[in-house]
From Swiss-Prot:
GO molecular function: 1-deoxy-D-xylulose-5-phosphate reductoisomerase activity; manganese ion binding; NADPH binding
Family of this protein: Belongs to the DXR family.
Keyword match Manganese: yes
Chain residues that bind NADPH: 10-13, 37, 124, 126, 205
Highest taxon of source: Bacteria
S-S bridge residues: none
Binding site for 1-deoxy-D-xylulose 5-phosphate: 125, 151-152, 176, 199, 212, 217-218, 221
Organism: Clostridium botulinum (strain Kyoto / Type A2)
Cofactor(s) the record lists: Mg(2+); Mn(2+)
Pathway(s) it belongs to: Isoprenoid biosynthesis; isopentenyl diphosphate biosynthesis via DXP pathway; isopentenyl diphosphate from 1-deoxy-D-xylulose 5-phosphate: step 1/6
Classification via Pfam families: DXP_redisom_C, DXP_reductoisom, DXPR_C
Protein name: 1-deoxy-D-xylulose 5-phosphate reductoisomerase
Reaction catalyzed: 2-C-methyl-D-erythritol 4-phosphate + NADP(+) = 1-deoxy-D-xylulose 5-phosphate + NADPH + H(+)
Amino acid sequence: MKNITILGATGSIGTQTLDVIRREKEELKLVAISANKSYKKVIEIIKEFKPKYAVLMEENAFKIVEDFCIDNKIDTKVLKGMEGMIYISTLEEVNTVVTSVVGMIGLVPTIKAIESGKDIALANKETLVVAGELVISKAKEHNVNILPVDSEHGAIFQCLRGNKKEEVKNIIVTASGGPFRGKKKEELIDVKPEHALKHPKWNMGRKISIDSATLMNKGLEVIEAHFLFGVDYENIKVVVHPQSIVHSMVEYKDGSVIAQMATPDMKLPIQYALNYPNRKESQIEPLDFYKISNLTFEKPDMDTFLPLKLAYEAGKKGGVMPAILNGANEVAVDLFLKGKIEFLQIGDLLQECMNKFYKSMEATLENVISVDKEVREYLGKKYDI
């Protein structure tokens, strides 16, 4: 039996993780959850799974859930804030922590979980983007597995198994292309949030949907792949594959390419990470090769989708630059969703902050938190938020 903590249990990945646990009750047990403020969903999770702990970040939501548990004589202990997230990430009885919260908020609990010897099922891209070197070194120090939950890195992880790192020529990360695949810059001038939120293949949260539309999501995945697999940026390629059947590939020095293919369903990489190193029966629809008419691959347009280009630049620059990129992007996406900036301004703001805030500093926990705060405060004042 594996005991699981889910950070971000009410979001897209968290909800699908619950689906996997629901199907595998004999092997997986939910011990603790966290959420921001979705108290209704948290109450439903508590009623069904009866976790020992539930953490709410927002004060009012915390009080509502706490009162519910007291009134209904439910044993779930309700905690709040970052202190609560760290607590449930370091519980002695927990084997694996699923980090599916969005943004920088996942960084400290993930590091604390690693230091406590927990395997990490990682769906929070920002953790590796801003502090990849630190996270990977701590994972090695504490003999912890970092198991990627997203479809691309989960695919790469599987394609690398049983092979030697020195035999790898290129890692090829596939991208659906998002809702604006094939569009040119001039066609994206009047894009509104409702257009950008309509992803052609995946049902995701609002922030990651916008990142997919700008291709920043793929840029973050490139940086993540660099740290996860120790491959230089020159050897990490992005290929647009609109069918989303091939989830990523590894090209070897002898010319062989190993690809991981499956019906697009996030439950598969989640299930793989939670059951690693074993494989379990899955409920997802199997591929029918007689029905797959064609698989196409295209080069990404980095001039139109500037954030992808900037992610490569930030990764190669190293140090705190990825943290600057990430902090600026989190704020820029929020500004776009609130109608305060245009779609194409997201890339412009990333470029502005990278130019303004870069310092030649090591990406220590203190440094990345500090520069992230600077970026957020600057953009907050600029746009009065």
